[in-house]
Amino acid sequence: METHISCLFPELLAMIFGYLDVRDKGRAAQVCTAWRDAAYHKSVWRGVEAKLHLRRANPSLFPSLQARGIRRVQILSLRRSLSYVIQGMANIESLNLSGCYNLTDNGLGHAFVQEIGSLRALNLSLCKQITDSSLGRIAQYLKGLEVLELGGCSNITNTGLLLIAWGLQRLKSLNLRSCRHLSDVGIGHLAGMTRSAAEGCLGLEQLTLQDCQKLTDLSLKHISRGLTGLRLLNLSFCGGISDAGLLHLSHMGSLRSLNLRSCDNISDTGIMHLAMGSLRLSGLDVSFCDKVGDQSLAYIAQGLDGLKSLSLCSCHISDDGINRMVRQMHGLRTLNIGQCVRITDKGLELIAEHLSQLTGIDLYGCTRITKRGLERITQLPCLKVLNLGLWQMTDSEKVR
């Protein structure tokens, strides 16, 4: 019986080629006509993102991508008009323009001149020339958009958020990292809480507001009232929010992940508000909140015991706080306590005794632990990731 690979049905070849990386898919297509035909089957390229340098005209580029069924594109460098891409990819689903610093409102405006119903994800991160004008175009012609990345687009203002709230009703994920001009008014637009005609993006599930320095507790009030389906909220480096703002968030039943890293005004009181509410968080990050101490760990054990991931790096916690927390946190998978310089071997022994499900722990910069405590941690049955970083001990204590 003939068993040579050339006897395989094209469908089987396509299944095999589907497991190859992008470069090897292309190489397989060059072997023979049978492999070429199989390699061009759309199932082989399902989910693949084409990464393109648009430098010169290539008439065969987009027909080739469409023949493979590729609908996700990342532009690595943009020296041609963006409209060249839009016209060539009629059914495009995802367009990543992150880091295309030369993209302007004018260039985007010429590309988006009619509705593009297929586009679901648009990444404009670090496209620093983009302003509210572009958001007006996006809101008008990309009404099916579900993911919008605007991190580092520092010229966007509250007016831009009003346009988003008006036109992008299907939006599920929005990244506004380091959009420095945004204030509580803009968040109110998104949440449908202002007197504007915009309904708001009430279907949002993920919202990143990292390093939006003008936001205050009023933004959290808007979010808690209008964005009730939110699952992930990133407020890291938002220095204007305080414990009082967390009281607003404490009854958001859909919220699963909350990032408060480097929010300088958050203290044990804020953690108490979160723990006393009706949250069902699986992930909490309060790293570098230096007003968070051992009392917060007691609150977490009392009201946030469903956490799978907890980050407390550089917080003012000690072995006593660890002792108050670990007995109730049996489901914890990831614990980050790097640069918590008051933690000693005693704390590690408590962790090893009670947190048997841990798969990862960060001990970077925990300078008071020794070989003894480390040996206890390495005996955790599920441990896969151990970050020591600045962990220090004498030569005689080093693990061999």
Curated annotation (Swiss-Prot):
GO biological process, one term: SCF-dependent proteasomal ubiquitin-dependent protein catabolic process
Subcellular location: Cytoplasm
GO cellular component entries: cytoplasm; SCF ubiquitin ligase complex
Keyword Repeat: yes
Ranges occupied by LRR repeats: 144-163, 170-191, 203-225, 229-250, 254-275
Superkingdom, natural source: Eukaryota
Annotated ranges, domain F-box: 2-48
Residue segments, region Required for down-regulation of SNAI1: 2-48
Protein name, entry field: F-box/LRR-repeat protein 14
Protein's organism: Bos taurus
Taxonomic path: Eukaryota, Metazoa, Chordata, Craniata, Vertebrata
